[in-house]
Amino acid sequence: MSFIYGLQSAARNCFFFRFNLLTNWRKCNTQAVTSRDFHQVKINHIVNKSLGLGVNHGDRWTPLPENFLFYRTFNTKRKGCLLSSRSKEIWMISRKCTAWTDSFSRQLPMKNVPVVPAHSMSHPLNCLPTRDIRSFHTSPRCQAAPAPLLLMILKPAQKLLAIIVGRGIRKWWQALPPNKKELFKESLRKNKWKLFLGLSSFGLLFVVFYFTHLEVSPVTGRSKLLILGKEHFRLLSELEYEAWMEEFKNDMLTEKDARYVAVKAVVHHLIECNQDIPGISEINWIIHVVDSPDINAFVLPNGQVFVFTGLLNSVTDIHQLSFLLGHEIAHAVLEHAAEKASLVHLLDFLGLIFLTTIWAICPRDSLALLGQWIQSKLQEFLFDRPYSRTLEAEADRIGLQLAAKACVDVRASSVFWQQMEFAESLHGHPKLPEWLSTHPSHGNRAEHLDRLIPQALKIRETCNCPPLSGPDPRLLFKLSMKNFLEAEKEDLNITVKQKMDALPIQNQKQIPLTCIVDKRTGS
């Protein structure tokens, strides 16, 4: 567990420590820490030979800026890359002014830097709570796609009505005498073409309804189903926002809190650098930081951003936080909540038809209940969850592009999910199949991001971002894992040897050979 201790301690201290480095590069009075140095801290924690920022230094005071801006070179030819710097020469001067060789060196000076204590941890097991890791999602499962309040209330009533109607049809059919049943069947055979025409008309209306409610996303170019109006859905988002504020009213950080300032700076920088993305400038983005150990973050469709401090304690650096917030912003810009709610309502409507049919044709209530359960599970695992995973993958792709345009080190995006996967395995959690979850597995997300990183790096180049320097954080993470496993193996061998040495050894009394010979000869 020493690795998690080192990882989280370094995350909590270096996360705020790096914000200080982002703001003081022109002053030349801050000791620079490169990406290699930072990851060496984690390795040193693993082998308990800390050479730099370690656990013993966890209670030092570290400054945190009120805001920061990433460096962007001015380029009038590329309107897609909004800029926030004076010129590329500033960045070159900064590289000469400080030994900071990581991509964080492209920062502008800040003012009014508040001072906050970096939190230290008393026990390594407290760094990544087991419950929080297993339930971690960057978007809450239920709240990512809020349904209309009226339909949420009527949904159980609709199912109950479908069951009553289906069961009533079955009872009516069972109560009919045999001769009337034959007459009814004969009537159906005579009017089979009328019945076929009626069903075909219903199916045609359904298809027309579906295609007339398709909209093409201006960001991805993908067609999506939107049944609810935007204004209607925004009103529902306001209702959900009020519910969240009521729940977290006692846990909200103030706007002067350093963690709030940090999150606000990251979000505003991402928004500023992606003003050309359709929909971003139309949303009023408001940040809320919740003081909670849960590792979570989500954005409501109306631009209300909720970030939990547990997530801030879990990210290694500003790059990981920028990607995660970019992922959540992508959810809002792509209108995933409205899209998911529309699909759910459409499937629920079809489900009511199947539910009525199941209760009508099943001869017993027990079989009808079994059929209803099978139908709900098929809908959940064949449509709901796969579609949710598809939306998550799309948000990862667009969020990575948003982070790339903000000159973030996009290589750190996959490292976060590798850390989460390793933490789960370290806690002994069973690896559940991905099809059981609404989100892709941590390992699959990391692999998906690794495939997208080359394209994101090209986006950084087109936006004239400074080139990334220093070692690849993915390579450093693998090195950390290797050192951790070797250290764990060495510690295990030492523990076994100590236990063996501690076992009581019975001293056998040595019998002289002459005594044995004398006994055998009988002398």
From Swiss-Prot:
Query: What is the protein name given in its UniProt record?
Result: Metalloendopeptidase OMA1, mitochondrial
Propeptide position ranges: 46-143
Free-text comment on the cofactor: Binds 1 zinc ion per subunit.
Family the UniProt entry places it in: Belongs to the peptidase M48 family.
* Its biological purpose: Metalloprotease that is part of the quality control system in the inner membrane of mitochondria. Activated in response to various mitochondrial stress, leading to the proteolytic cleavage of target proteins, such as OPA1, UQCC3 and DELE1. Involved in the fusion of the mitochondrial inner membranes by mediating cleavage of OPA1 at S1 position, generating the soluble OPA1 (S-OPA1), which cooperates with the membrane form (L-OPA1) to coordinate the fusion of mitochondrial inner membranes.
- Residues recorded as binding Zn(2+), renumbered to this chain, are 327, 331, 392
Transit peptide located at 1-45
List S-S links within the chain: 407-465
One cellular component GO annotation, for this chain's record? Answer: mitochondrial intermembrane space
**What is this protein's gene name?**
OMA1
Give the membrane topology, semicolon-separated if more than one: Single-pass membrane protein
Q: Mind telling me which CDD domains this protein's record contains?
A: M48C_Oma1_like
Sequence segments annotated as region (Cardiolipin-binding): 148-167
